[in-house]
């Protein structure tokens, strides 16, 4: 591919296209990948469709002002995002250790973007072009639009609008608001006059003209009073709906952060249009010499079926970003994309995913949402399925069957996560059987996250009984179809509500599983989630109940070690945790003991685990009839 297949990145590109001045310039913390899994590509192509010229400055050197000037000054303004992931999450682990890789950067190496990228980029743009409008968006800006607890500073920070000095913030999925805002700018409206576009947030000194709004506790209140913080979050949480949500206002000293109600969800036709735009579907050729961009590998042959999630896991911020209403593409649109993939020269016959935040949530949860919006005080699937929930996998299954029939398609995988409780609610087993027979390869990843009902309740996850029933059914189905496939559980330690007793309960469950799970992570308090509010305040904002929060690094290390108690390096911490919890009965050589009396000889865990994995899985299969678990994916995306 040539540079002409991509949006312009240099003055040379502008000359070839006869562009003197760009309408917009997108500054992003990711490398430039022109694929619909990347927000920069979508917004750039949507604006191009509307007749605007758009340039890309990807991963500029924030220590060199000239990098921000290389495409000149745009006619209407700069659009700034940190990339597909919050820059702080991208740079640091849950234990605040620096990461050494970055899948969204050349060669997978870190160091191409600054901490708090949105703030840094905006300040540099202001330095280069003082009067040029700046609009911020993407995950980092969206989840920091109000005063928020910042785990890395361990303090409450102001709205990112204040710290970045940006003129406007677009939250959530930005196609509709950016089109409306860009057209208003084209018609001659000044950026500081754009105050009525849904899905936007701005700063105002005088709120007297506002009507029908809710004022939440101020920055000064939430930064000094944890009850006020919890109250502010509760209001934000309940008002994230395009039909019933109200304008929200939060005072920051003498100014106010004003959030307009969310944009309506995209219609199916609008979704189809967005995903049919002329993406190059790969990274820019300028990265070839550095080994390309690793992030493209998993998504290049994956298909986004829908957006949104009504699972409402407490540790996930999707409610604040994509929303609870499912927005799906038509089958025709998805089949066209699948057919197009088969004609790509590096297609090997495998479509890696057809899904979204949760693969088997392909339609709105219920008909009520269409007229009244999402329910304010209850969830669709937690603590149990709502009576209005539409439980049906037929349409999704018919789509998968059609994709499987496309010439040159060997296998269609589902990797974006299956919500197992929703699967169990479906009395028709056809999808479950087809999933096991055609759409996994040896193992299925799902996310029970924990097995203590006390912790699961705070996580917004189904009870242990639901998971155990799922495990039994999964293995029963695999036995009937003569497949020896396994479950890989994603588990989480140190979530609010998880004390040593709960961690030990989970460790005992793992013991019965028969193998050491590798997919374990500590709870990561990222902006925008209900769990992060619990972590900071020690309060469940929705119930106002006090919540135990493991914050000391020692206890967090103990809890994580308990989940991998068989690793020799974890022996001392596990023993200390068991003694502290008065569970010495789990130390010894008995069948239920987690560790022996004496520290085992240190072996290479990886080598040993690889050697025994098949044996352990075979044990696991037998044990699974009694107990077992599953799992799911990513930082941002554990279902």
From Swiss-Prot:
Binding site for [4Fe-4S] cluster: 309, 313, 316
InterPro entries: Elp3/MiaA/NifB-like_rSAM (IPR006638), rSAM (IPR007197), rSAM_horseshoe (IPR023404), UPF0313 (IPR022946), UPF0313_C (IPR024560), UPF0313_N (IPR013704)
Protein family according to the UniProt entry: Belongs to the UPF0313 family.
Cofactor: [4Fe-4S] cluster
Protein name: UPF0313 protein CLJ_B0249
Gene Ontology MF terms in the entry: 4 iron, 4 sulfur cluster binding; catalytic activity; iron ion binding
Native source organism of the sequence: Clostridium botulinum (strain 657 / Type Ba4)
NCBIfam families: SAM_YgiQ
